[in-house]
Swiss-Prot record:
HAMAP family: Ribosomal_uS11. This is Small ribosomal subunit protein uS11. One of its GO terms (cellular component) is ribonucleoprotein complex. Located on the platform of the 30S subunit, it bridges several disparate RNA helices of the 16S rRNA. Forms part of the Shine-Dalgarno cleft in the 70S ribosome. Keywords: Ribonucleoprotein, Ribosomal protein, RNA-binding, rRNA-binding. The lineage of its organism: Bacteria, Pseudomonadati, Campylobacterota, Epsilonproteobacteria, Campylobacterales. It comes from Helicobacter pylori (strain Shi470). It holds the Pfam family Ribosomal_S11. Gene3D superfamilies: Ribosomal protein S11 (3.30.420.80). SUPFAM superfamilies: Translational machinery components. Part of the 30S ribosomal subunit. Interacts with proteins S7 and S18. Binds to IF-3.
Length: 131
């Protein structure tokens, strides 16, 4: 029998960051939450699909709320107390995600910014669905 090489898991280094930026990307299929420091270095992230929501349940407001709570609990371990919010996309979890960041204890919201890209009549949109 060949021996298995067992590699040790990297230990997560706790950073002491007071301010962060919460990026909420709400698509029609999923909601991604990424928390960075002010320079843009990623501290932690969470997605609705990564929390066990599958299929159409990933795009629900409840799944977005759970993703925000998961990401903020990880960020609090790194000392994040004040955040700005950048929201992108037209998804259904967008408003709920913003509200749940604001209602989380120990985290103060400094500003909210919408960074959804809007075309100046660029690419042709996909054809209308016929169901």
């Amino acid at each position: 029998m060949a021996k298995r090489n067992v590699t040790a898991k990297k230990k997560v280094v706790k950073k002491n960051i007071a301010r962060g930026v919460v990026y909420i990307s709400a698509t029609f299929n999923n909601t991604n939450i990424t928390i960075t420091d002010e320079m843009g270095n990623v501290i932690c992230w969470s997605t609705a699909g990564g929390l066990g929501f599958k299929g159409s349940k990933k795009s629900t407001p409840y799944a977005a709320q759970q993703a925000v709570e998961s990401a903020l609990s990880k960020a609090k371990e790194h000392g994040v107390k004040e955040v700005g919010i950048k929201v992108q996309g037209p998804g259904s979890g967008r408003e709920t995600a913003i509200k749940s960041v604001g209602t989380t204890e120990g985290v103060k919201v400094l500003w909210i910014k919408d960074i959804t890209p809007l075309p100046h009549n660029g690419c042709r949109p996909p054809k209308r669905r016929r169901v």
